[in-house]
Amino acid sequence: MGACEHCKTCPCKIYQGYKQPLEVPDHRDIMIIGDSVTPLETMHNTHMTGTAIKLLFQAMEQVGLPTSEDKVYLANAVMCAVPKKKGKAFPKEPLIECRGRLLKEIQKVKPKIILTLGKASYQGLTGDFNVKITAKYGAIEHFDYCGDAIVIPVMHPALIMRAPNDYKVFLTELHLVKQLYGGSGSNDTGITEWQILKTEQECLQAVEFLKQFPRVAADLETTSLDYREAEFCVLGICFQKNKVFVLPREMQHMAKKFFALDNLRWTWHHGKYDRKVMWRRGLTDYNVEGEHIFPHQNDTIYMHYVLDETSAHDLGYLTKTFLQAEEYKYKMNQEFKNVTHDTYEQYFDALCERVAVDADYTFQLEEALEKEMNKPGNESLVKVYNMVIMPAARFLAQVEQNGMLVDPTILEEMGIKYKKLLADIQSEIEEAAAPYWDKERYMQETGAKSASDKFKPSSPKQMSWMIFDRLKLKPRRRKGRSTDADVLKSIDEDIPLVKLVLQHRGVNKEYSTYVKGILKKRDIDGRVRSNFSLHITATGRLSSKEPNVQNIPASKGVGNVRRCFVPPKGKILMEVDYSGAELRWMAFLSGDKNLKEIFIQGRNLHKETAKKLFGPDFTPAQKMRAKAINFGIPYGREAKSIADEFAISIEEAEKMMADWYGAYPDCKKYLDWCAEQAVLGNYLQTPWGNRRRPGLVTPDTIAGLQNEFKNFPIQCSSSHTLLYTLIQELDYDEDLRRNIRMFEYLKKKWDVAVVDLIHDSVLLEVPMDKETVTAVSRYVSEKMIETPVKLFNCEVPFKTDTDLGPDWGNVQAFNNETGMMELENEHHEVTEVPYEEWIESVYHYDNYNQPWYVDAVSFQQHPEPFVRDISGEPGC
């Protein structure tokens, strides 16, 4: 039945349909099903003519699939022009009514392969309106009503136009289609075989057996993604393709025997998590430095990151991309939703299969990724992987284990203040809304069955009614009836209610993130352990989450959240910070002589910029503007943002930016050149060897991509400078039987622990005696300063500052040359105070007698609570 004939009999008759029937051909190899046609397509009797289908054909040609009309038939789930509303689900009715017509087209076309583009087309084909489509992408499915056709759901290319980083994932899905279309099937990954080691004797025999192999790949299955709750289920160790030993829970204590094998190179996929779980459960031995032994020489997640920083790095994606393996996780995950300590036996067979396949695929992936990395032209990638990325991954695992000690009483006090502040703002909101809030009218106009007597800003429905229906406001940014922060901030009218709602949301977010969030993540030894990631940002900058300890505000809301982070008794917190690291890298990379001269002569950059922009008699406020320009321009900050921050006109902000470019002309040339590479499709490379590739460039993303390209070289170089400094190899250590790394040396010589990395600074726990504090500050500063010179012969000098504090919220400047504290008051006047006098006045000795600290120390001395005793449990 043609589209026109179907539309005439369709009871839906809501949307514009075709006036002339479309021809449905006989026999095409590939049938592509979109969601619905557009009004323009119905008028011109065409379909699938937009930019999204052009992108689809471009991708199909790239992987070697046909796109000609004699091979490919383009169809739609719905043959009328259904309006697509952002944030709204595609309506069910037309999909249901049009399904019969679609199935008849399939019977006539008799395709070998059917591609469904996005969610609506899959729903139209299958009638499944509860599908989680992202779990289906790349899956191979068969349905009786599709005959012999293979059905493969893929991303809608229109989504990729808005999120071009997904283009490579999309290509991977099409690579699978190409293999099936060409009859080659999946790559020969083989059939995984595994042996379960059920006794200690079998484990010891396996250990002896592994002494003949050079490498293994391993994977750990647990009961939770939260390392604090995760319990060991099974450990898989792959020693040959398709050959895996599986260590069950009952033999978990034998893992140490395998980890002690020094002939093996161990490869994991994101092994940092596995390491943390094994440590948390007491399943590793310790070396002479007190660090636990967890062999982690290679990691496929980081190998892929240096090859492609913009794509996904999960094991499922990588196995499809590099091994052409069929997707398996979307099937297996269904069995793992309820794996707990008590359901271990129920899911044991599935756990063994999962861990064996993951270890086997990791083993095969390592080989495939090594081939990619060793291709001609990739020498810089090998260099940065071996010199920075892998050593940094192991180092960050240690930083995570160190954790940051948290005083919960500080957060509890702040929580009380936050609750009061939120209640006060809520009262102001109710008062401001009272003249407009009409409960009965709201229920009548919205169809709500009930409503509160007072306006509730936390109700999305009440908020949208108040903004759009009652106050009839017209935000410059509109997302349907959304009242998110971007929408409310774009309201030009001066409405007190809107400002109060924004304030309430901001304060509530602070309370949830920085008070409740940190308390929730606090471990039983009193510390929070963030998750640092090297592979999340395309710019190469380190990121942190759960909690984000790089983004703890110095002062926010009701007080300084950083005050809750404290050192253990007898130690002090030391923060050593690069001064203007990114701008110094900018001077070096751009070669701008004016900027280089300022740093070489040791002049204050912000004062010098203020002179160039405002003359020699600049004010403190103008110096702050100069500082904002200095840091903002490399990040692509625009004139409007500067104007809004300082309450000046856009014209003034534009003149300031133009004057900055005039003062540092080679910086402008360099930034423009970086932005141009994104448009030209070229990659950028840092002196360290990292690359930033543009990927798919679309009109929607080009501006943001150009800003990323401007910032990438300086941001990545700055981040790696700090990381490398801390992981660099020093002299040979007799105890370790290898060269000791700097963070290990700090621990061994001074008992110093690295507890946080904040972009360009490092936070340390240091013994509080003056001699140690001075020595550590000098040593760390010296090493940080020398790195750019030693590695890159950088003529721009780098500078560091040291701050000390009894907690992270009260750090003050320390001069490691004089041994004096340099205390600055609110008028920016500096007073020198002897360190000994200062430490006596600020150190919180009473804190270490409080119950929370006594409990933490008690746990550290007797860490049994970390390890769950499962002796006598079923299956043991």
Question: What do these predicted regions represent?
Answer:
Residues 238-267, 404:
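Nucleic-acid-processing active sites and adjacent nucleic-acid-binding tracks
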Residues 155, 285-308, 314-316, 602-607:
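Conserved beta-strand -> loop -> alpha-helix junction used to position metal-binding or nucleic-acid-contacting
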Residues 112-118, 217, 263-274, 575:
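Acidic beta-strand-to-loop metal/phosphate-binding motif
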Residues 1-184:
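A polyanion-binding, active-site-adjacent surface
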Residues 179, 183-247, 284-295, 310, ...:
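Conserved "right-hand" nucleotidyltransferase catalytic core of DNA-directed polymerases
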Residues 227-249, 575, 582-617, 695-699:
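Metal-dependent catalytic core segments for phosphate chemistry
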Residues 420, 424-427, 431, 435, ...:
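C-terminal polymerase-core module
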Residues 344, 394-401, 422, 450, ...:
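Conserved catalytic core of nucleic-acid polymerases
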